[in-house]
Amino acid sequence: YILVPLFNRMFRLQAGANDELIDNCDLPYYMAASDAIFIQRKDVLNSANIPLAFLFHKVAVGPDTGNMGELLNNTGNPTFCPDNKADIIRALEEARQLAAWGKGEVNYEYAMENMSIKKIGKMYVQLYESTSLK
């Protein structure tokens, strides 16, 4: 978070995006203004960014790895091979098209049905009850 912005400034590199971190207070505005949420992480198995994107009525695009890839594939959201630039571009283009077709609304409905606090809470209770010693 520190070296990349300094490197970019030192060599006057511009990657097309601001290298400053987005303040948490401003994040909802960025989310609302976007058509799709791009999850660029390469080496993680899961991400809270997917439910976040769904709850903001957005298409989520992420790597086809771990739980992220499974959830994105199961919900019809684009995935990509993180080491393949052409595949990333394809997934982003697919996300743009899906957003225009209203996929974000479908994602929101999915999140409300399957990712609500009430439902997840019940699942935790069931898990603890099934594994507790009696």
What are these model-predicted stretches?
Residues R41-D43:
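Aromatic "clamp/platform" in nucleotide-sugar-dependent glycosyltransferases that forms part
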Residues N74, P78-A86, E94-A100:
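Conserved acidic donor-binding segment of nucleotide-sugar-dependent glycosyltransferases
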Residues I22-S34, P51, L55, G69, ...:
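Short acidic alpha-helix that forms the nucleotide-activated donor recognition element
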Residues G62-D64, E70, F80-P82:
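Conserved acidic donor-binding loop of glycosyltransferase catalytic domains
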Residues I39, A53, V59-G62:
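Short hydrophobic beta-strand element within catalytic cores of glycosyltransferases
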Residues Y1-C25:
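Nucleotide-activated donor-binding/catalytic signature segment of Leloir-type glycosyltransferases, i.e.
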